Amino acid sequence: MLTYHQSIFKMIMANWLNSDHVIIDTETTGLMASDEIIEITIINMRGEILLNTLVKPSRPIPPEVTKINNITNEMVADAPAWCDVFPAALKIIRKHKWLAWNSSFDARLMVQTCLQTGFFDDLKPHLITSIIMAIETRHIDAKAVYDQWYGEFDEKRKNFKRQILATAAARHGIPTAGAHRALADCLMILGVLKQVCQPEVA
């Protein structure tokens, strides 16, 4: 039986599933301030794909990154540039709140990819501010809520333990094939939410 604490977070996740929120995942050249998005996927709560594309970065993908996400420089050689991809993503973000697993990372990478690729270069300051606000104020961290629901406490951090997406998916019987590719990760997030929100068996 769920605790009262778990019931609250289950209700939050159930509300997401019944909303027009979308789920976003990005794959990147790395984690640093100079890194860029090389793949982005957006799906809705029915699992329908709204956007799913590789992105050609302005610099090569490091080999150690390819080992994680299996995205090679050859795969992105003919992919569209971020400046061509982002307007479609922004149109969706302006209309919908969006979830991601550690959403602050995806939000940061969207903004810094705009900076790295020159997307902001010819825009007036108020438009740049509007875009950044649309990204930064409309995201929801699905991982943080799941962490609270799962309830594994980290005594060292004095907080709930951070749950890895693939681990959470496997825990709930969600296929993890293709992990660290954007579409697979989006579908894992959706699958985890659906499994958490299944009615309890008496």
Residue ranges of each PLM-predicted region?
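Short, hydrophobic/glycine-enriched beta-strand segments
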Residues: 21-25
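Short, contiguous clusters of charged residues that form electrostatic/catalytic patches at enzyme active sites
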Residues: 3, 83-87, 187, 191
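A generic local structural motif
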Residues: 8-11, 84-87, 125-126
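Metal-dependent phosphoesterase core characteristic of DEDDh/y 3'-5' exonuclease domains
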Residues: 14, 18-20, 33-39, 44-71, ...
